[in-house]
A protein has these predicted regions:
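PLP-dependent class I/II
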Residues: 1-135
Length: 135
């Protein structure tokens, strides 16, 4: 086997010894860490759901089945997609994925990544809450 390969963009890629060792260590000794991360992310899902119900009831959350990405149903806000993007980016200062990126069914939705410290998530939701209040 060659010590290098070509990437999709035509660039030469070199496999690094530490990458192999890291993967081996993760598979051999990563169960406890993974369990903790999964538990923390589940806590962030619950936190987001509660926060939205209590503070931004016009935005509903679609509970993820096996992900740290949450779709926010913002259709009750009555905004078109351009206005919705402006609300998130310019008013709330948040960079989420536009739901229409995933097809026309995503109109009125935004996708939120909750794989972050809870304090960061809480701050983001507070910024969103303030932006919605100011509509």
């Amino acid at each position: 086997m060659l010590p290098y390969r070509f990437g999709n963009d035509g660039e030469v890629r070199e496999e690094h010894l530490f990458a192999y060792l890291s993967v081996a260590a993760a598979y051999s000794h990563g169960t406890e860490w993974l369990d903790q991360v999964v538990g923390y992310i589940k806590g962030n899902v619950d936190f987001t759901e509660t926060y939205l119900k209590e503070h931004i009831p016009a935005i509903k959350m679609i509970r993820p089945q096996a992900s740290y990405l949450i779709f926010l149903d913002c259709r009750e806000l009555g905004l078109n997609q351009k206005e919705l993007n402006r609300l998130f980016v310019e008013d709330a200062h948040l960079a989420l994925n536009d739901g229409t990126t995933f097809g026309k069914e995503g109109k009125g939705f935004m996708r939120l990544n909750i794989a972050c410290p809870r304090a960061v998530l809480e701050q983001a939701l507070k910024q969103l809450e303030q932006a919605v209040v100011n509509l």
